[in-house]
Amino acid sequence: MAKTDKVKIFFQHVMPKHLISRLIGKFAAARAGWFTQLFIRWFIRQYKIDMSEAIEESPKAYKTFNAFFTRHLKPELRPLEASESELAHPVDGAVSQLGDIENGRIFQAKGHDYSLQELLGGNEEDAKPFVDGKFATIYLAPKDYHRIHMPCDGVLKKMIYVPGDLYSVNPLTAANVPNLFARNERVVAIFDTEVGPMSLVLVGATIVASIGTVWSGTITPPTGGRIQSWSYPTSGHSAIHLKKGEEMGHFKLGSTVVLTFAKDAIEFNDELKPLSVTRMGEVMAEIKESDD
């Protein structure tokens, strides 16, 4: 590892990541007038963001940085291409890793893997349906669209908030910080779907000021020191049904989504591999036919 990379990793270990993230969160939520506008325009230039994709193309339309960062895209630019027998990509981003969950372990990077059970909050019963299943880890860069959508129809079964650290989740950190996605703060959503159980894990990171869902609003902050979970009815008027392509959550500043599926439920698109660019709505996987 290059000396500069070692320095970057060292500073991640020692800097007050939660404090920095919350301070940035306060700024991102503030209506700071000309300063907010200046920062938004700098961000657009720095990360080469194509504002023609946004419903509100003008930076002036956004009164806070958070409003800009969670901007909605024109629906016609992210059509739902996945058919009834396919799963759609949930986000714009890039594949970090994907493949089989082996003996309850998920591959992170060369020399590093982590526990499925830890990722989902430590409950063995929550992890059991996904043992020997499939996973996909997708990294959202600062330039990306930061709303998360459903890869298939689903009914929300459980949500879990897992407190943790706030390391960066960029490729350098993923390659050098063990257990990264199972040690960072995260929100786990477990669904019953047409392909069986599915989890969507929204992983926090340095300067991620907020993680939210469409059914509960902002989950974090505030943060807590203990795991919290909420169970939901899967039938009746109170059940939370979300359709394929429908929004399920968002990040205020970028991070990572980890998806898990049961054994023999899906087969990923052959073209997908680490660093593959993903676009919400495009085909991610095929639903495997049941042997029944």
Swiss-Prot record:
Give the membrane topology, semicolon-separated if more than one. Peripheral membrane protein
Principal place of residence: membrane
What are the GO MF terms of this UniProt record?
phosphatidylserine decarboxylase activity
Q: Which cofactor does it need?
A: pyruvate
Cysteine disulfide links: none
Pathway terms, separated by semicolons: Phospholipid metabolism; phosphatidylethanolamine biosynthesis; phosphatidylethanolamine from CDP-diacylglycerol: step 2/2
Cofactor info, note text = Binds 1 pyruvoyl group covalently per subunit.
Question: What does the entry report about post-translational modification of this chain?
Answer: Is synthesized initially as an inactive proenzyme. Formation of the active enzyme involves a self-maturation process in which the active site pyruvoyl group is generated from an internal serine residue via an autocatalytic post-translational modification. Two non-identical subunits are generated from the proenzyme in this reaction, and the pyruvate is formed at the N-terminus of the alpha chain, which is derived from the carboxyl end of the proenzyme.
Reactions it catalyzes: a 1,2-diacyl-sn-glycero-3-phospho-L-serine + H(+) = a 1,2-diacyl-sn-glycero-3-phosphoethanolamine + CO2
Q: Please give the GO cellular component terms listed in this UniProt entry.
A: plasma membrane
Matches recorded under InterPro entries: PS_Dcarbxylase, PSD-B, PSD_type1_pro
Catalytic residues, chain numbering:
D92 (charge relay system), H149 (charge relay system), S255 (charge relay system), S255 (schiff-base intermediate with substrate)
EC number annotated for this UniProt entry: 4.1.1.65
Q: What class of enzyme is it?
A: lyase
Q: Which processes are annotated in GO (biological process)?
A: phosphatidylethanolamine biosynthetic process
Q: What binding partners and quaternary form does the record give? A: Heterodimer of a large membrane-associated beta subunit and a small pyruvoyl-containing alpha subunit.
Family stated for the protein in its record: Belongs to the phosphatidylserine decarboxylase family. PSD-B subfamily. Prokaryotic type I sub-subfamily.
Q: Which HAMAP family match?
A: PS_decarb_PSD_B_type1
The protein's job, in short, is: Catalyzes the formation of phosphatidylethanolamine (PtdEtn) from phosphatidylserine (PtdSer).
Q: What is this protein's record name? A: Phosphatidylserine decarboxylase proenzyme
